Design a protein with these regions (language model features):
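Short histidine
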Residues: 21, 31-96, 222, 228-233, ...
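Active-site loops of AMP-binding adenylate-forming
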Residues: 62-68, 129-134, 289-293
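Short secondary-structure junctions
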Residues: 47-50, 156-163, 493-494
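ATP-dependent adenylate-handling active sites, centered on carboxylate activation for C-N bond formation
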Residues: 93-96, 101-103, 111-114, 118-120, ...
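N-terminal glutamine amidotransferase
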Residues: 1-29, 34, 72-192, 206-210, ...
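Short, polar/flexible loop-turn hinges at active-site or ligand-entry regions and domain interfaces
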Residues: 44-50, 68-69, 134-141, 192, ...
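Conserved S-adenosyl-L-methionine
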Residues: 163-166, 420-431
Length: 529
């Protein structure tokens, strides 16, 4: 099955699945995605100029390659030419309508969800965008790896699987991976200046935002008042040259509300504050767990606000696209725990580790909470262009202490552009699940709530009940119990581990479970002094 939001080209001709035929083959194609440079691809590959749907260019290019006996080049098209986020499945049948090949592929960050069975068993092949799509399937189900294309060749009696890792963003190496023309003339000896780094980051961020402003439906912007979402909204407003619609979600006295209000006033947006009470937040947790298909503590906490604001946008506006600010905390190593990093190399490598796993956590949260309400989420600051640009910085210059604030290199490129109020541009990191709350933190409200939802006896036997990533708190136990009620105990391993702070205050890797809220860290109070 396929549910289409019709963000690009809402005509009947763009309904999926797409079916393309010639004398030798039939191609059936399904894609959950947005291909932002589809018009450039139409021109470059000399495709039919009547194509209006962005996703349709992919099977059309594949058909063209097949007709030229060059289908082996399809992976290079995805790797080097396509700009966007996607999860797609392509079926190729021969002229006798016998299935010959299945190709499945996911963007290299994993913005769009895709699950699959790692081995072909029970005489079936499962590919689904949600766990809910395979509730009756008894075998192992896992995340389809981002940045991979898997080709199932069925032309012979035995199915042959060819898995290709096409991702390139993790190959980025500082400091000499940009400015290729200069490198060619100076034999790799050139060290970019600060101004060149700042300019490159400014360009990459702007490009990443602008790519995601193309839509046939109105766009909403989630605005927490943090530097990430504020930059996205401010740059979009400047590019579009019109007042945009911004939304902030929180409880009364939530710290995000004031900062978001200041940004909205600065950029002149139509701003809406979606206020919820602790009781309203607690009431949606069961459906949040079902929606995001996760038992991870911090993911559930942060999902509540995003779930509530997305519900509001869906019910009270005509917006269908939602731009969010997720990504820089992982890319730019800006979680407050990174002040504890033992050295620059450890910090730089941990950024790659966080981004490689972001599809299990923040990306899953954003995609599911938004799409739950018939909306499409877009994540500009996880664009590979921006990631490569930022990761070209030397590791030591990404350390929070380098300039006395986390992600200085993301803030500084826009310091002289009069985009944002100074206090917003330099606002310290505040987790989404913390920023929605006021004097009493959201995680404390939840912990009080679950105190009588999980018994002491249940906690005493937690290791026996849930031996995989055993819940260490009543809050974690409550989420796990909900997850297993919806999806069964066999699906727990969909999530590889709890999201955890990387280091403790002594620069040692964290062992065992610690609360993921930044407000529990000593560095939180230190950076507010």
């Amino acid at each position: 099955g396929f549910h289409r939001l019709a963000i690009m080209d809402d005509t009947f001709q763009s309904n999926q699945p797409f079916i393309l035929e010639d004398e030798e083959r039939t191609i059936i194609f399904i894609c959950n995605g947005e291909i932002y440079n589809f018009k450039d691809l139409i021109q470059y590959y000399d495709l039919n100029k009547e194509i209006k749907n962005d996703c349709l260019v992919i099977p059309t290019i594949y058909m063209q390659l097949c007709q030229r006996k060059q289908e082996q080049n399809f992976i290079d098209v995805i790797k080097n030419a396509v700009e966007g986020e996607f999860a797609f499945v392509l079926f190729e049948f021969n002229h006798s309508k016998v299935l010959q090949k299945i190709i499945a592929c996911r963007d290299e960050i994993g913005i769009r969800p895709l699950y699959y069975q790692p081995s072909i068993t029970y005489g079936s092949l499962i590919l689904t965008s949600e766990i809910k799509g395979a509730t009756t399937y008894p075998g192992v189900l896992t995340e389809f790896p981002p940045g991979h294309m898997m080709i199932y060749d069925m032309s012979d009696e035995k199915i042959v699987l060819d898995s290709v890792d096409y991702s390139t963003v993790y190959d980025t190496r500082p400091p000499l991976c940009l400015f290729d023309e200069r490198l060619q003339t100076l034999s790799g000896e050139y060290q970019p200046t600060d101004d060149e780094y700042l300019n490159d980051i400014r360009i990459s961020v702007t490009n990443s935002v602008n790519r995601r402003l193309v839509a046939d439906k109105p766009i909403a912007f989630l605005l927490s008042g943090g530097v990430d979402s504020s930059l996205v909204a401010a740059l979009a407003s400047r590019t579009l040259g019109t007042s945009i619609c911004t939304f902030c979600c929180g409880m009364e006295e939530g710290t995000d509300l004031k900062y978001a209000r200041d940004v909205a006033q600065k950029i002149g947006s139509y701003h809406t504050e979606v206020i919820f009470t602790p009781e309203q937040g607690l009431a949606v947790i069961p459906d949040v767990v079902k929606t995001i298909e996760s038992w991870d503590t911090t993911t559930v906490r942060a999902s509540v606000g995003q779930y509530i604001v997305s519900r509001y946008i869906s019910k009270h506006t005509d917006c269908k696209v939602v731009l969010v600010g997720e990504g820089p905390d992982e890319v730019c190593s800006s979680y407050l725990i990174n002040w504890y990093a033992p050295n620059a190399n450890a910090l730089g490598e941990s950024a790659k580790e966080y981004v490689k796993k972001i599809h299990y956590f923040d990306v899953k949260r954003a995609d599911r909470c938004i799409s739950r309400w018939g909306l499409e989420g877009r994540v500009p600051l996880l664009d590979p262009e921006f990631i490569r640009s930022y990761w070209s910085l030397p590791y030591e210059e990404r350390m929070p202490a380098y300039r006395g604030i986390e992600k200085w290199w993301l803030r500084q490129p826009f310091a002289d552009m009069d985009l944002l109020p100074e206090h917003v541009l330099m606002r310290k990191k505040e987790a989404f699940s913390d920023g929605v709350s006021g004097k009493k933190s959201w995680f404390q409200i939840i912990q009080d709530f679950v105190a009588d939802k999980v018994t002491d006896e249940e906690m005493a036997h937690a290791a026996n009940t849930y031996p995989y990533c055993t819940p260490a708190t009543k809050e974690a136990y409550y989420y796990r119990k909900l997850f297993c009620e919806y999806f069964g105990e066999d699906r727990q391993e969909i999530i590889p581990h709890y999201w955890q702070p990387k280091w403790d205050a002594n620069g040692k890797e964290v062992a065992g479970y610690v609360d993921p809220s930044a407000r529990t860290l000593s560095i939180y109070s230190d950076t507010t002094k």
